[in-house]
């Protein structure tokens, strides 16, 4: 019988509301991890419990809509008329922007989704408007904007929705959705641990630099003075 355990996720964001007003300004639903805006300030909960489920008969049980382990395993109709935009912040460094293009290429090959475009929120092209237009040109009737951000902040609450709405004004009959950022997803635990282990192996001389660090000479041990 599948057992259920819980772990505590601590989140804080001081740029939009003080912690003293946190619980007064927002209502947190433990089952959906959604935050309801009740005044003009956005805030995140100081802490909340997230359910975690183990495997049962070879597949994962459906977990929380925001943080469940089963995210991405239940298909919900991504088809030929859907376009996906993966948007990051954008950088003045060309190398950083090229990494998003490489990630989008990997994502498209892995998922088989026909319409996937990269976009940068600012500082670089293609913009969200550019990517939205490319999706529509390829036949998309619904555009899914996926922020390549770890946690929700001003860019997710305000900037990306505003830029996407402006892009959508150019077209009629096109719907769009802005998904949640990555958040404390269970799969990210493995990603972070893998990165740590690889970099430790590199500084010990047992592994080459990863693609992110390659040529930067950043992945090395520093000694405090």
UniProtKB/Swiss-Prot annotation:
4Fe-4S as UniProt keyword: yes
Protein family membership: Belongs to the CbiX family. SirB subfamily.
Subcellular location: Plastid, Chloroplast
One MF term in the entry's GO annotations: identical protein binding
Phenotype for residue 135 to A: No effect on the [4Fe-4S] cluster binding. No effect on enzymatic activity
Subunit structure: Homodimer.
Substrates-to-products reaction catalysed: siroheme + 2 H(+) = sirohydrochlorin + Fe(2+)
The species this protein was found in: Arabidopsis thaliana (Mouse-ear cress)
Protein's name according to its UniProt entry: Sirohydrochlorin ferrochelatase, chloroplastic
